[in-house]
Amino acid sequence: MVKEYDYIVIGGGSGGIASANRAAMHGAKVILFEGKEVGGTCVNVGCVPKKVMWYGAQVAETLHRYAGEYGFDVTINKFDFATLKANRQAYIDRIHGSYERGFDSNGVERVYEYARFVDPHTVEVAGERYTAPHILIATGGHALYPNIPGSEYGITSDGFFELDEVPKRTAVIGAGYIAVEVAGVLNALGSDTHLFVRKDRPLRTFDKDIVDVLVDEMAKSGPTLHTHANATEVVKNADDSLTISFDNGETITVDCLIWAIGRTANTSGFGLEKTGVKLTEKGTIYSDEFENTSVPGIYALGDVTGKLDLTPVAVKAGRQLSERLFNNKADAKLDYTDVATVVFSHPVIGSVGLTEEKAIAKYGVENIKVYKSSFTPMYTALGDNRQPSTMKLVTLGDDEKIIGLHGIGYGVDEMIQGFSVAIKMGATKADFDNTVAIHPTGSEEFVTMR
C-alpha cells in the first residue's frame, strides 16, 4: 500500500523544515524525511554551534585583551572547554525541541529515516512507500577532503565540533567562511593556529579592501596566515602529531588538521537516478528561479543546488516555494540578489551587494564611485589592543545608487541587516546623507561618509 500526501520533503535541514511547515500551515498534508538529526548542517555542525564558539572566542578576547583596559584585574584560573561544549550541545538540543513543537503545531508528519526514490513521485522508507504530486529535495551538502596522501588524518568542520579540547597546534586549510571562522576561534581560545590558503588571500569573493584589513589584523593578532600554499601530503608521526607538506616547500607539524576546502552537494544514496533530475556541471541539482528541477513536480533548494549556501537563503526559498505551491501565489520566489552575509572572523566582516571589483567589472570604472572610512571602534580604543574598522560604500551612476556596502569591525554583524533593507529598496548616497547618525556608534560611519 502506498501512502498518499500532498507534499514530501526529503531533508530536515533549514530549507526543508521551513518549506514543510509553511506548506502544512496552508493545509497541505506533509511528511518530512530526515536520516540524521533535524536541523541539518546549520543547527548541528554549522552556523549555530559555530556562533556559540565565536561568542566563546569573543569572551576570551574581552578577558585577555580588554578587561584590563577598563580597570578590571582579571585572573583566569582555567578555561574548561568541556563546559563550553556541553552548554553548546544543550542549546542545540533546545532548538531540536523547538523544531519538534513546530512540526506538531503545524501538523507535519516526519520519519527519521533516509528516503529513497522509487520513481519521480514515489519514495520508499523502511519498507513503506509514499507518494505525492510535489516532492522537495533539500538534502544539503557535505565537507570535502582533498585527494592527497594522508588526508584522512585531518578532520573537517564537522570534526571541529567533536573536539574535546583546544589543540595546542592547529592547521586550518581553506580560504572561505568556514576556514577563516574556525581558525579565528581556535586562535582566540589559545591554539597556535595557522591558516593556509591557495592564493594570495582568504575570502577572495569579498571586497579586497575589507579583506586586506583582516589580513593585517591576522599579522598582528593571529592566526598565522600562509598564502600560495597547497597541501600535498600529510604524515602521521609516532606521537600522533601530523606533518603537512606544501607545494611551496613549506612543512608544518601540528596536533590537529582541519580541512575547510569546500563542500559538495548530497546527490547520491537516495535514488535520484530514478527520477531523471538533471545535475549541473558542478554536480549540484539544477533548479530554476522557482526552485523547479528538470522534472515536473520535483523541486530542489538549499545547498544541494549550490546557488547560495546560506541558511536564510534556504529558509526563504523554502517558504516561497510553499507559498507558490499551496497558497496560490504563482509568482512567489526568492530574489537571490543583494543577499547580505557575515563572516564571523576577528574582527567580523559584513557585506551586501557588489564588491568594488565586481561593480567595476559590471558597470565600468567611470560609472562607479567609492566612499570609505577607517577608524578604531571605541570599545577597543582605550588601550593598546586596538582593532581596526573599515566601512565602504560602492555607488553607481550620477544618482549614486548604493550597489555595495561592506564593513569590517566591532559590531558589523549586527549592522548589516538594517542597511541591507535600504539597499534592497534602492537607497542612494543622498538617502544615507539625509539620515541622522546615531552617535557614538560604528554604524554612523555609513551615513556620514564624504
Locations of the language-model features?
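A Rossmann-like FAD-binding core segment of flavoenzymes
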Residues: 112, 116-124, 189-289, 329, ...
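Flexible, glycine-rich terminal cap/loop adjacent to redox cofactors
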Residues: 8-18, 22-36, 41, 48, ...
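Short hydrophobic core segments
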Residues: 8-10, 115, 130-140, 172-173, ...
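FAD-site-proximal beta/loop scaffold in flavoenzymes
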Residues: 151-167, 251-328
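Beta1/beta-strand and adjacent pyrophosphate-binding region of the FAD-binding site
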Residues: 2-13, 166-173
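Glycine-rich dinucleotide-binding loop and its adjacent helix/turn
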Residues: 47, 137-192, 224-225, 273-275, ...
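A conserved FAD-binding loop/helix module that cradles the flavin
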Residues: 210, 301-360, 431, 439-450
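Glycine-rich flavin
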Residues: 2-5, 21-28, 33-166, 199-203, ...
